[in-house]
């Protein structure tokens, strides 16, 4: 069972050393641990430092492409390198490496496809009250949109099984956290939570520079996800509101027309706005129909992409697959777990299988 820990980086030279030193060198049930550093166009020598500190793989971008792109490229590289489980963590040492064994345990046990580290944001000292409210609101919205029980939707500390990693695709460039959870719920993947601890903050968040901007961009991600996966419900709701508004204004015009005719012709403005609202309702209804047809085509396309990705990975394991641009293998040896280690216990007395096919 191979675990690859991926770390997206942008000018993290000052923090990467502590992050790598904190990672576990062995985990019961995992036979090989490797580290992939994704250098998102850093200008401070982050990639060179990663090699010096013993990272096993470095994926370099010539320029900054954004966190979501770096995350998705890292997942592709991990799959290409044969990872059975992928753990994503931050380069600023926000998350504790000691929590990784508990994070991967549900995936090892076959109880979850994705495990999200719950930071319990209500108790984080460096979170302002407004940030806590926004995090709670965002997680509630994502829970409803995804049909999962995720408690900390914006947490980037997560473990992903190979099947789930091959199924999910990131479409936006801002962040992957919300979109992948919504996709996972829509795809029927099992999402679990594990409470984790966080280290003291080492620098301000680069995604949360402006509260207004952060809310707008995350709201856009959620609206886009609703439009992609539930177009009939999303556009149908808007069309219904417009239709009811138009009919209400039309009824108002008829009431005043009947009450005051022939002295007055009624409130003509209500008639004009009402007709416009009904026309818009019809157009938005057509958008709902077209969105549903596009969604059906997208589902077929995603299924095809998953099959192509799995075929590419199978060919890659034979050594004949295409290489990933910018991916470099260093001289560091994988961290290996001794095969004699006992499997960790789970709540209720269950035990993890050390290898695929072993009885739990």
Where are these regions (language model features)?
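Cell-envelope/extracellular polymer assembly enzymes that use nucleotide-activated donors
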Residues: 2-4, 34, 179
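Short hydrophobic beta-strand elements that form part
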Residues: 4-8, 37, 60
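Short, well-formed alpha-helical segments that are part of the catalytic scaffolds
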Residues: 12-27
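Residue-level preference for short helical/loop micro-motifs built around acidic side chains
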Residues: 14-18, 44-48, 57, 69, ...
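Short beta-strand/loop segment that forms part of the nucleotide-sugar
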Residues: 31-41
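A conserved acidic beta->alpha catalytic loop
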Residues: 39-47, 93
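Acceptor/aglycone-binding surface of glycosyltransferases and processive sugar-polymer synthases
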Residues: 57-80, 85-87, 97-174, 178, ...
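Hydrophobic helical membrane-anchoring modules
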Residues: 171-360
């Amino acid at each position: 069972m191979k675990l690859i820990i991926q770390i997206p980086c942008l000018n993290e030279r000052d923090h990467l050393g502590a992050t790598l030193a904190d990672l576990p060198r062995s985990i019961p049930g995992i036979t090989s641990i490797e580290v992939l550093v994704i250098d998102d166009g850093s200008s401070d020598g982050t990639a060179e430092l990663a090699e010096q500190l013993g990272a096993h793989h470095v994926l370099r971008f010539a320029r900054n492409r954004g966190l979501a792109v770096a995350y998705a490229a890292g997942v592709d590289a991990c799959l290409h390198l044969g990872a059975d489980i992928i753990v994503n963590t931050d380069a600023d040492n926000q998350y504790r490496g000691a929590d990784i064994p508990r994070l991967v345990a549900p995936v090892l046990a076959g109880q979850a496809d994705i495990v999200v580290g719950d930071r319990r944001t209500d108790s984080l000292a460096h979170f302002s009250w407004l940030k806590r409210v926004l995090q709670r609101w965002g997680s509630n919205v994502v829970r409803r949109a995804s049909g999962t029980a995720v408690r900390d939707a914006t947490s980037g500390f997560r473990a992903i099984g190979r099947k789930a990693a091959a199924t999910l695709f990131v479409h936006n460039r801002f962040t992957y956290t919300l979109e992948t959870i919504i996709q996972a719920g829509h795809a029927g993947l099992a999402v679990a939570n594990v409470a984790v601890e966080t280290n003291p903050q080492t620098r301000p968040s680069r995604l949360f520079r402006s509260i207004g901007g952060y809310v707008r961009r995350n709201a856009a991600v959620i609206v886009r996800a609703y439009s992609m996966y539930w177009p009939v419900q999303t556009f149908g709701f808007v069309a219904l509101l417009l239709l009811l508004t138009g009919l209400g204004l039309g009824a108002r015009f008829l009431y005043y027309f009947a009450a005051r005719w022939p002295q007055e012709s009624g409130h003509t403005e209500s008639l004009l706005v009402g007709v416009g609202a009904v026309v818009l309702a019809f157009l938005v209804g057509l958008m709902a129909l077209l969105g549903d047809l596009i969604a059906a085509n997208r589902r077929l396309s995603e299924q095809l992409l998953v099959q192509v990705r799995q075929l590419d990975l199978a060919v890659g394991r034979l050594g004949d697959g295409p290489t990933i641009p910018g991916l470099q293998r260093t001289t560091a040896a994988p961290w290996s777990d001794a095969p004699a280690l006992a499997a960790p216990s789970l709540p209720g007395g269950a035990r993890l299988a050390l290898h695929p096919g072993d009885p739990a």
